[in-house]
Swiss-Prot record:
One of its GO terms (molecular function) is identical protein binding. Belongs to the BACURD family. It comes from Homo sapiens (Human). CDD domains: BTB_POZ_TNFAIP1_BACURD2 (cd18401). This is BTB/POZ domain-containing adapter for CUL3-mediated RhoA degradation protein 2.
Amino acid sequence: MSGDTCLCPASGAKPKLSGFKGGGLGNKYVQLNVGGSLYYTTVRALTRHDTMLKAMFSGRMEVLTDKEGWILIDRCGKHFGTILNYLRDDTITLPQNRQEIKELMAEAKYYLIQGLVNMCQSALQDKKDSYQPVCNIPIITSLKEEERLIESSTKPVVKLLYNRSNNKYSYTSNSDDHLLKNIELFDKLSLRFNGRVLFIKDVIGDEICCWSFYGQGRKLAEVCCTSIVYATEKKQTKVEFPEARIYEETLNVLLYETPRVPDNSLLEATSRSRSQASPSEDEETFELRDRVRRIHVKRYSTYDDRQLGHQSTHRD
C-alpha cells in the first residue's frame, strides 16, 4: 500500500540515526517518508534486488527515522510508487511524457536500480524517433468517454462545450463574435496551463456554449454562455463572453491539483498510528474530510438553478 499525500514531519521532531535490522523480517511492513510522500511496503519488496534500498533495509546502511517511526528518505516522492511497483513485479508501464521518464530514470540511478535505468534509457531512445505534441486537447466522442476521461485524470479538468447546430432561433448581432472569443480563450488557456490542467472539447453536447470545471473527479462549477432573449416579438439566442468569470473558475480548479486530504489507502495504511492518537485528533481529521465534501456541494449548488442538460449529473 502506498499513499501520495504530502505530509511534513512534526515541527521540532529530530530525526535519529539507527541501523535497520532486516534479517528475518521479509514480510514485515515498514513505513517510509520520501520527501513528504508516505508509503507502506514490505521489507521483502525493498530487498528483492541488489539496490541501495536493499543495503538500507538489510542492515548494511544506517537509516534516519522520526519519532513516529517513519523512515526518512531525502528524495522527491513523486515517482517512488512506480519504483516500488518495479521492485515488486520486475516490470512497469513507463510514463508517456519524456520529462517524467527522465525524472524516473534519475530516481532509479539514485537508488541504483539498473534494470529500471535500462528501461528508461530504452524508452527515451525510442521516443527520439517519434515526436509527441506538448499540448494535446482530446475531443470527446461520447458521454461515457467524457466520464472516463474526467474520472481517470490526475489533473483538474476544464471542458468547453460548443455546438452551434443546437440553436433553434436566430442569433443576436454579437453572438457569433462572442462564440469565437470563447473558443479563442479556451485555446489560450490550453497553451498556458496544459501541464497542470486537462482541457477537453465537447462538440456533440446539448448546449451551444458552456464551460465546465472539474477537480478530483467531481464537477465544481459551470459557466453557461447562452440565453434566450426576446427582440422584435421573436426569440433569439444570445451568446455571451464572461471572460472574468472563466478566468476565475480556471484559477479555482488549480486548487485541486493535489489531494486536499489523505486518500482511503493512506488512511488505511496509517490506521495503526491513528489508533494511538488522541480522540480530538481523530475528530479533527474527520471534520476536515466532511468540511471539504460540503464545500464541494456548496460550490456546485450555486449553479443548480441553471439548465445543465446531460451535464447535470453530480455524484457526491
